[in-house]
């Protein structure tokens, strides 16, 4: 028996599944990435180098920061530009903002309902309103972090080759610190919740191509 699912819900992007069962044994189980061609290389050709980070950011509305910073760092490497510790720190904050936003969305709203056998996310929200508020507050903090450092939440503009177009003030950095302290207890509560979940005993061999290529 062959199984084919062309669209899997609750993932960031588009994916499918192909499986085959013969005499009760699973002989194939394969996840398919169904992302279409982006053709960014062709779009970037012959464009001014200062435009590349904003064009590359359009690869994704959920994770534009990583594409922005990757294109900037690639150009800095090509030009031999070295940045200072302040720039590195702010880029790390910017990247953390995206990760916090994305992970809060994915872990709570995409994954948690399945662990509790709840098919409807609205039922999850009604059953665990306090955890829902924690997840939303954490996600909002991630958005705020990207906005304050990057200039706006989606497709941030501030990062550029060599540094930032506009540097955050001391007041903004202190506000980020204050907001981080506010959401930390909720993050700990959610962490304890996920620590109690029963995870499947799954072991997979990985090639780690992107890591070994560094």
Where are these regions (language model features)?
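Active-site bordering "gate/hinge" segments
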Residues: 1-214
